[in-house]
Amino acid sequence: METLCPAPRLAVPASPRGSPCSPTPRKPCRGTQEFSPLCLRALAFCALAKPRASSLGPGPGELAARSPVLRGPQAPLRPGGWAPDGLKHLWAPTGRPGVPNTAAGEDADVAACPRRGEEEEGGGGFPHFGVRSCAPPGRCPAPPHPRESTTSFASAPPRPAPGLEPQRGPAASPPQEPSSRPPSPPAGLSTEPAGPGTAPRPFLPGQPAEVDGNPPPAAPEAPAASPSTASPAPAAPGDLRQEHFDRLIRRSKLWCYAKGFALDTPSLRRGPERPPAKGPARGAAKKRRLPAPPPRTAQPRRPAPTLPTTSTFSLLNCFPCPPALVVGEDGDLKPASSLRLQGDSKPPPAHPLWRWQMGGPAVPEPPGLKFWGINMDES
């Protein structure tokens, strides 16, 4: 039972654990701080992802987000000169990471803001950053210019309270997107602060910052004029192409086979409403076209044949073989055929006389006797 039931895990760890990326200050180590490759990769990813997050741009009434600067004893990471270029502006070189150094932290806080200004001072773009500011730790003086540099968003620490924000002029434009502004202003752009009645206009090729909320007057004129002038032109060819496509489909052999060659459209019915052909048919279309039927002349119908008033039908005449006996007038049977004819009357058509051969016996002889050649008359 002891092996099946594992020891219960404590809900709260016995000893507080720090971040997996930060070393625990258990032993005051002397020398260069060591970090794992995974920690370095995570730090680099965070440093590269923070400026990209601000590239989405603030809203019309919002302030641009700034990346925080780790300072003082709150910063668990105090790397030396080994940090990559993307991370140098986040930390300042200090003493031992294990032992908190308040004086070094204050010096780093004071030097964090003007360091970028000194880099910009070399180019002559922003002279107000060249002055060393002795502000209390954790706070940088706000520049007198209402327009702020892009690098100040990444290097300056977050302002502790919004009370310092009203220093911006009421006529100043809202902060623009940091990613859309170049790191250093062009050579021809003046750096004097704008007057109280004018708003600073950044030098941009397409002026996307100006047209963020209200497009320039020239832009709406072009779309307004384009639908009225260009809409009828493409509409007519589209209708013609669609009509031509429908005509080809309805005249195709596959369509005709599917419809059972039912001419369901007025243009396909053969009649006076059919439009005349534009030109002589070519190729297979000429073979499929049926010639026009010749005009039919009104011919008089043949007169009905005159039928006899009395019927000439006789059952004995149509009988296959002449009967031997028939019923007489007295109701008795009598021979059907007789050679005793009265006067010049002819025997009936079914009389065997008409079947006799000339020169043969009047009474047909049996086939056996005829075959033997026996003559009954002679016997």
From Swiss-Prot:
Renumbered residue ranges of the record's region BC-box: 39-48
Subcellular location: Nucleus; Chromosome
UniProt-listed GO biological process terms: neuron fate commitment; regulation of transcription by RNA polymerase II; stem cell differentiation; transcription elongation-coupled chromatin remodeling
Keyword entries, A-Z: Chromosome, Methylation, Nucleus, Phosphoprotein
Region (Interaction with SUZ12): 311-359
Region (Disordered): 1-27, 72-105, 137-244, 264-309
Annotated Low complexity bias: 221-237
MF terms (GO), sorted A to Z: chromatin binding; protein-containing complex binding
Modified positions (Asymmetric dimethylarginine) in chain numbering: R52
Assigned GO CC terms: chromosome; elongin complex; ESC/E(Z) complex
Entry domain remark: The BC-box, which mediates binding to the elongin BC complex.
Quaternary state and interactors: Associates with the PRC2 complex, which consists of the core components EED, EZH1 or EZH2, SUZ12, and RBBP4, and various combinations of accessory subunits including AEBP2, JARID2, PHF19, MTF2 and EPOP. Within the complex, interacts with SUZ12 (via C2H2 zinc finger domain); competes with JARID2 for SUZ12 binding. Associates with the elongin BC complex. Interacts with USP7.
Name the UniProt record assigns to this protein: Elongin BC and Polycomb repressive complex 2-associated protein
Organism: Homo sapiens
